[in-house]
Amino acid sequence: YYIMIDASLFDMPVHRLRLFRQIKAKSVLGFNKWPSIKHYSHSFDFDCQRWHVTKTFELIADYLQLDTRGLDAYDLAVPGPIMQEVAQYLASLSGKAVVINIFAGHADRSLSQTQLAELLDKLLARHPGSAAILLDHRREIRIPLPPEVVINPFNTLHHAMALIAQAELIISPDTSVVHMAAAWNKPLIAVYKDVLLNNRLWAPGYDNARQIIVKCGKVHQHRGLVDRIIAALPEML
């Protein structure tokens, strides 16, 4: 290999350094790596508190003297047959699709099922006729659901991506779902805890998104969160 790129901003596990030695690439690029670590040919200084994660692409492209246009956008590939399958499924639902994910990588950042029930009631009252699709691959949602609400019937990540790509609105506290929505510039309401390093670095990063910051405590304990989400809803779906 001529160039290897280690895009991680924080971690530097020993097994990765061993992998670099085994591959023996001519050049290894990284971010915020200690000068004493000789496995890297060049390390970019990256300000995780001020910059968005997409700036990593810009720094690499500048260093390699590549065209930087369009580097602020994600490009996710979903197989055509899966996009068609999901399109047919959405066409079978009554109303415009709203994809809701209440789960994050940590329980402190997840919405509660009580919040979900309140959100569904207020969402359907605000936009009657909408169809809500809940992402729940672990099958953890236990609350009774109204007829307009369904659990995602598909089991693959590609299907979840296709749902997000074709939905009218996404609501999520999880940054992986947030950045899937960003790939297709979908209307999004993203819920974040007030963690500076996370809120700027992993922000949605596009104009069609609304970012709600929960200032203190755990997301699932925030009593006024649902009203803030409803207030951020677009007027038309």
Regions found by a protein language model. Give the residues of each.
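Catalytic machinery of carbohydrate-active enzymes
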Residues: 1-237
